[in-house]
Amino acid sequence: PALVEKIQKKAPYFIYGISSSIRFIASQINEKGIAIHKPPHSIIGTSDTLLPAHLKSISSIFKCPVYSRYGSYEMGGGAAQTCPDVSEVMHIIPELVILEVVDDNNIPVSPGKTGRILLTELTNYAMPFIRYDTGDIGIASDGCSCGRSFPTIREILGRDYEQIKTFSGHRIY
């Protein structure tokens, strides 16, 4: 509640924070029926997953666009960000990383398939990470209907250790 009051009072132009914290703040605003008088220009959540449903809900509550940024602490942050036009797709930043979605044998999966995320860093010349296994699970994508030519990933599902693998090999997230 105190943070919600500060947001109302300061009317920030932009909010950047941990996704779960942003979801919590949005839920407090929604539950208490608080109206945002001056919405921020946009919100970016990072550090954990914002699913497309979260993006839409937070956007509705704050009355502004909401984006999810994906990256790795080990590599300095941003690897991909939600498309401003298609919330179900994330654009990879090709100047910074190569992002691959691979199967258990480290073979790239086809679009629409789920796999582990590997990142290759393109900016650290002293000690680069090459095909670094982030421990994250994502869904491969073959592009975005927005028309931008950036490589894409459809969705970040979460951490590999947050899943259950059945005896038949099926994974539950």
Where are the regions that the model predicts?
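Active-site glycine/GP-rich loop and adjacent strand/helix microenvironment
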Residues: P1-Y173
